[in-house]
A protein has these predicted regions:
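Sec-dependent N-terminal signal peptides
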Residues: 4-14
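Rhodanese-like catalytic fold shared by cysteine-dependent sulfurtransferases
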Residues: 2-4, 17-41, 50-82, 88-123
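Structural scaffold elements adjacent to functional motifs in cytosolic proteins
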Residues: 43-45
């Protein structure tokens, strides 16, 4: 009986570890290609407003993932239009991507954040 429980536990652990994260995490080149090719895309910078004002991707809107109203603000996004999300280094955008996916959005996340971005920056 113990052996059966051990085997079932091992299988469950393997299955849970192999589940997908629910969004695409891509490097800066792929992220640039995605936002350039898309007919419509919502680019969301999840850094603080001060960080956003220092420079952001062209066309990006700012919704601070650590803001108290983040969940309310993302409701304003169109669920029919893909979301491209980024932050400074990739940690906050991964948190935001999880929340967006759980809310029903299709999400691509910039792995490495804006510090990995080689394209145009808007101020």
């Amino acid at each position: 009986m113990k052996r059966v429980i051990y085997i079932i536990t091992a299988i469950l652990m393997l299955v849970s570890c192999s589940q997908k994260i629910g969004y695409n995490s891509v490097d800066a080149n792929k992220f640039a290609a995605i936002i350039q090719k898309a007919n419509k895309i919502q680019i969301v910078d999840v850094r603080t407003p001060d960080e956003f004002n220092e420079g952001h991707l062209p066309g990006a809107i700012n919704i601070d993932v650590n803001g108290t109203d983040f969940a309310e603000q993302i409701k304003k996004l169109d669920k029919k239009v893909p979301v491209a999300v980024y932050c400074r280094s990739g940690r906050r955008s991964k948190l935001a991507a999880d929340q967006l996916v759980n809310s029903g959005y299709t999400v691509t996340e910039l792995d490495g954040g804006i510090i990995s971005w080689q394209g145009e920056i808007e101020k």
